[in-house]
């Protein structure tokens, strides 16, 4: 089995259904003796260019280990799901264990927002 990094972009109106979609894709991979090594929900982010007149979309990254038949079925499900705007599959040499650069930036943004909220509540309490 080979290792792959799969990134897919979901329509922003379908953001509520992303967990169900991810669960379905995970079940597809693990059901055919594959493994999901890393799953990252990058959230709603700005697109580099408009896709179908949209400027924001929901990003999800999965690092998986599976066979070619499983990968073909996964790509087929991406292709025929209208909520998935784009997808990218990259073959990798091994499964990374550390968080990706994008996930680190998402965590930094969340920490920055949390500290700003804490500072705002502290000033409001004074």
Curated annotation (Swiss-Prot):
The keyword Amino-acid biosynthesis does not apply. InterPro entries: Ribosomal_bS6 (IPR000529), Ribosomal_bS6_sf (IPR035980), Ribosomal_S6_plastid/chlpt (IPR020814), Transl_elong_EF1B/ribsomal_bS6 (IPR014717). It comes from Bordetella pertussis (strain Tohama I / ATCC BAA-589 / NCTC 13251). Binds together with bS18 to 16S ribosomal RNA. This is Small ribosomal subunit protein bS6. GO terms for biological process: translation. It comes from the Bacteria. One of its GO terms (molecular function) is small ribosomal subunit rRNA binding. Belongs to the bacterial ribosomal protein bS6 family. The keyword Signal does not apply. Keywords: Ribonucleoprotein, Ribosomal protein, RNA-binding, rRNA-binding. CDD domains: bS6. Gene3D superfamilies: 3.30.70.60. SUPFAM superfamilies: Ribosomal protein S6. GO terms for cellular component: cytosolic small ribosomal subunit.
């Amino acid at each position: 089995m080979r290792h792959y990094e799969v990134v897919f972009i979901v329509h922003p109106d379908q953001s509520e259904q992303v967990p169900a979609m991810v669960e379905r894709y995970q079940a597809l991979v693990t059901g055919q003796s594959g493994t999901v090594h890393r799953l990252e929900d990058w959230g709603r982010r700005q697109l580099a260019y408009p896709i179908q007149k949209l400027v924001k979309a929901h990003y999800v990254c999965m690092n998986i280990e599976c066979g070619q038949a499983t990968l073909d079925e996964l790509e087929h499900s991406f292709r025929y799901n209208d909520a998935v705007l784009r997808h990218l599959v990259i073959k990798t040499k091994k499964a990374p264990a550390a968080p990706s650069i994008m996930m680190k930036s998402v965590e930094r943004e969340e920490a920055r927002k949390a500290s700003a909220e804490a500072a705002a509540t502290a000033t409001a309490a004074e």
